């Protein structure tokens, strides 16, 4: 296997009951690749990327990440998710937390960073996307594009090796493109 290979997908299948979402899907994704999955609604695009982050378990086939079989029994899913970040279609921000808390919670709980270090990192990233003034706002006070940028910042704060986006153009702010 090439040392630059991040994902190797072999003969992947996903079924929901009698509905086959995809079957025989094989692909190799290398470090530095930008991959876009295009297809009709209901075609399995979201399901596929959810399989890459193990939010969905494939029905059959194998997924290797950095040479390790992530579909194997006993695989450490939490360790994998620290390396493979995801920005969800609905952004999945915690409505009861401020923007700053949405970003820092995983840094303090998962990465065990101090509150101060987490806050500093979050504010730096918020500044990069032009939302430092929204640090104390709640998700309901934000536009769709702002929520999307917060979700991206939250994912980037974890410093993943790979970042998966579900419907990345769904809430683009024209002024940010």
How would you describe each model-predicted region?
Residues 4-177:
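ABC family nucleotide-binding domain
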